[in-house]
Amino acid sequence: MADKKRYEELINILDQYSYDYYVIDNPTVEDAEYDQKMQELLKIEEAHPEWVTPESPSKRVGGEVLEGFKKVAHDTPMLSLANAFNQEDLADFDRRIRDKVGDDIAYMCELKIDGLAVSLQYENGKYKQGATRGDGTIGEDITANLRTIRSIPMKLQKDYSIEVRGEAFMPKRSFQKLNEIREEEGQMLFANPRNAAAGSLRQLDTKIAASRNLDIFLYAVADFGEMGVETHSAGLDMLETLGLKVNKERRLCNSLEEVYAYIEEWTEKRAGLAYDIDGIVLKLNNLEQQRQMGNTVKSPRWSIAYKFPAEEVPTKLLDIELNVGRTGVITPTAVLEPVRVAGTTVSRASLHNEDLITEKDIRIGDTVLIKKAGDIIPEVIKSITEKRSGSEEPFHMPKNCPACDSELVRLEEEVALRCINPKCPAQIKEGLIHFVSRNAMNIDGLGEKVIIQLFSQHLIKDVADLFFLSKEKLLELERMGEKSVTNLLASIQASKQNSLEKLLFGLGIRHVGAKAAKSLAIHFDTMDNLKVADKETLTSINDIGEKMADSIVTYFANEEVHDLLEELKRAGVNMTYTGPKLEDMSEEELVFTGKTVVLTGKLEKLTRNDAKALIESLGGNVSGSVSKKTDVVVAGSDAGSKLAKAEELAIPIWSEEDLIEYLPDEGGLNE
């Protein structure tokens, strides 16, 4: 008969075996011996379930089925990092550091793992909770799934109570095996290891998470200072002594030249790693100097992520298709011979507008170079003209809409061509898809395919029709069974109670994003008040600029809009603001309301006018100079004296990417 002492001994032995194998990559026993001891442990646990603790090695194989993922607050925010794309960006970062703390500095350089940022909490040395980064303040509880990662110790070598940050990832070999299995089973393949890791950690069945063979590198403690160390490098060393897995390829650099050499080395060697990396992270090593530098709204001033240059890959441009957005903008899209770029297969890419196609002389049949902007959005960089055979065809934008044949127009100060026919079926369809989306009316079960079916079968012609759908009609649709239809109708019914801002955003009024919709709802309280507001009243609201005000007035002057609103009222859709009033709202919810914002440097994705309009739509006032009254500086590349002054005055600095997070769904302000 087993005794508890033997049980505890087995736990310690198996923990040590796991540490040797998964953390320090130095296995000390054969698999057969590990399996024999694990079986012995499992038999004891079967006989004595009262002895089993959450730290038992048996918990790593999964088996628990979760109901969902609850939200958890991070005691210390998990900030994102500002990006650097070249040596000039790094030199600017270094200058800001030296201006603030002097020249006696060193940088800890670490590989930027391409995975999922997570937080691990240990209480008295025992693993207590694991969470995703989420929005940096609130994440999701994935404790059970993280427990299945063998390189995460359930007990530390010392009884510390700490919160550790790291990057969970799927090794390349595990990713390849997983996709091979999925292909054999006829399942959709994962695009890249990052997506596979994220999907694995959000499995409700922990056995599935356990089968995915994830790994982790830990790179920080929420507050290293609590551990009695003075430098980041010493903190990483201490994490290793606690039994945590820290990446060995880190290097302490005493100059920018050493940083550049480290980057160059890993730019060349990255392909040979067992896992994906997408850059190098620099951290000011001295913790006191880190505290002196402080943080911006989104990121620490003492750290930066150098992003590897986007991979550029040649492929064939087979065709150029035209897409009609919900506001009528005609967007050309490149149809490509499928090719792998930055870990995913790309068969379509953005061409932005006609002017860009003409300027770059891109022709159908060309061999073109493509890359992923920010490693996310595929785009065509240029044609490789020396590979032309003479059969390539220049592209010309049509004069009429590809969806409704109406004449296309180019509005003043706009680059894009636009269809202005309010009856255009493509615009109506895209508008319906937008209306039911998460940030708008959030109607579960009404995905794009269902909307297309409903529209093509003439069951809906506008958003009001959604609220008059019958069970009988829905059951006639493909892949819509009794349960799906019941759930969908319940979701439609629930959406009627949404607060006014959700409806306003869903209506797709030109230039009105989610944040502006909320400000309008708060200010006017009811749809009836808003629809009679004049331009002067609208522009008196901090969030609303002249262009947006004109758009709102024009929208509500349309008799068809009045008819639509009456139909929505008849359906029982709420048209009153039911959320917290302005005085009760947090600063985070208000974003830029009442704040002065300065733009500086070169923006890569937004025009200066777009950025200004977006800031105004979020309630901010754009100023041309930095002063003590400035609340936020949005800095692009090549930012000069304004950025330096903002740093000197300790003004929060946003990147262009931070600002883009608040774009309306269609991604543009001139649409």
Curated annotation (Swiss-Prot):
GO terms for cellular component: cytosol. It catalyses: NAD(+) + (deoxyribonucleotide)n-3'-hydroxyl + 5'-phospho-(deoxyribonucleotide)m = (deoxyribonucleotide)n+m + AMP + beta-nicotinamide D-nucleotide. NAD(+) binds at residues 31-35, 80-81, 110, 133, 167, 283, 307. Its cofactor is Mg(2+); Mn(2+). It comes from the Bacteria. DNA ligase that catalyzes the formation of phosphodiester linkages between 5'-phosphoryl and 3'-hydroxyl groups in double-stranded DNA using NAD as a coenzyme and as the energy source for the reaction. It is essential for DNA replication and repair of damaged DNA. This is DNA ligase. It comes from Listeria monocytogenes serotype 4b (strain F2365).
